[in-house]
Each structure stands twice: as structure tokens, then as C-alpha cells.
Swiss-Prot record:
This is Uncharacterized protein YHR073W-A. It comes from the Eukaryota. It comes from Saccharomyces cerevisiae (strain ATCC 204508 / S288c).
């Protein structure tokens, strides 16, 4: 199972789209980051939501 790492900057968040869709409250860092162009955006980094993404929290 994927897990979320909370806390200090530069920690990595793992969140596949399917897991986010089934339980969005478990992934607060990406709660408002799903966009209509099918990308995650967090700071200056953008990832396709169809892939398993590693998002640097800053």
C-alpha cells in the first residue's frame, strides 16, 4: 500500500490516481491539485495523474 509522508519540506508523497479517487481525504497534499488537463501540479512540478507520481512537498 502507498503511504503519505507528512511533515518537513522535501518529503515525498506517493499517490496513484486510483488511490486518490477512492480516498481523497487520505491525501490532503494533493486534494486540490487534480486539474482538468489530467496533471498533478505541486509547486513547479507537474505530473500526469495516470502515472504513479512522486511529488516533492515544498
Amino acid at each position: 500500500m502507498d503511504r503519505i509522508i507528512r511533515g518537513k519540506r522535501d518529503h515525498i508523497l506517493h499517490c496513484p490516481l486510483a488511490a486518490y479517487s477512492s480516498n481523497p481525504r487520505k491525501y490532503p497534499y494533493v486534494k486540490n491539485s487534480l486539474r482538468q488537463d489530467s496533471l498533478w501540479s505541486r509547486g513547479s512540478a507537474t505530473f500526469p495523474v495516470t502515472l504513479w507520481s512522486k511529488v516533492i512537498l515544498k
